[in-house]
Amino acid sequence: MIPGILGTKLGMTQIFDESGLAIPVTVIKAGPCILTQIKTQESDSYQAIQIGFSEVKESSLNKPLLGHLKKSQAPALKHLKEYRVKSVEGLEVAQKITLDSFEVGKTVSVSGKTIGKGFAGTVRRYSFTRGPMTHGSKNHREPGSIGQGSTPGKVHKGKKMAGRLGGKQSTIKNLEIVHVNTDNNILVVKGAVPGKKGNILSIQQEEI
């Protein structure tokens, strides 16, 4: 069983069930991918497969990556992803990976990079409560105290402060598959997934 597949986010829409209830869904163009490497217990001390997605010109990749892909007779692929597996039986290098093993009703975990929001303050980034807006107060959206005095004499690591918001890897678990179109490589899952349209996603099956 293929543990996962790579794809791109096409956008969100809604579908209606038998009772007429509107369900928000995300449409994903998943695959086809190429199996570029098989790792075994004997050669790598663990079992995994590496798949590639999104064919590009050879001039877009560096020579080490092109050499790695040519070992598996794979074309120039922009994105590579590794998945751990319990067994590599029945899998072959250069094998084409599609949505054949994905079934309606099962759940998947979808990983991707969230939309970057740029530099943000603590109110927007961490939902800090703002200060009084009137009665002479000048502390409206300030972070407030960031620590103690001469003891410990430093700001503790991990303190919530202003900084970049978004643009980080995120995973949404237990998203139900509501539709699979193997002919057009379309996967429809219930709910939202990280990122904007065109974002690269990793779709991993819950039960491997």
UniProtKB/Swiss-Prot annotation:
Its main location: plastid. One of its GO terms (molecular function) is rRNA binding. Residues 129-165 are annotated as: Disordered. Keywords: Chloroplast, Plastid, Ribonucleoprotein, Ribosomal protein, RNA-binding, rRNA-binding. Pfam families: Ribosomal_L3 (PF00297). It is found in: Plastid, Chloroplast. It comes from the Eukaryota. SUPFAM superfamilies: Translation proteins. GO terms for cellular component: chloroplast; cytosolic large ribosomal subunit. One of its GO terms (biological process) is translation. The keyword Chloroplast applies. InterPro entries: Ribosomal_uL3 (IPR000597), Ribosomal_uL3_bac/org-type (IPR019927), Transl_B-barrel_sf (IPR009000). PANTHER family: 50S RIBOSOMAL PROTEIN L3, LARGE RIBOSOMAL SUBUNIT PROTEIN UL3C. Part of the 50S ribosomal subunit. One of the primary rRNA binding proteins, it binds directly near the 3'-end of the 23S rRNA, where it nucleates assembly of the 50S subunit. Belongs to the universal ribosomal protein uL3 family. This is Large ribosomal subunit protein uL3c. The lineage of its organism: Eukaryota, Cryptophyceae, Pyrenomonadales, Pyrenomonadaceae, Rhodomonas. The gene is rpl3.
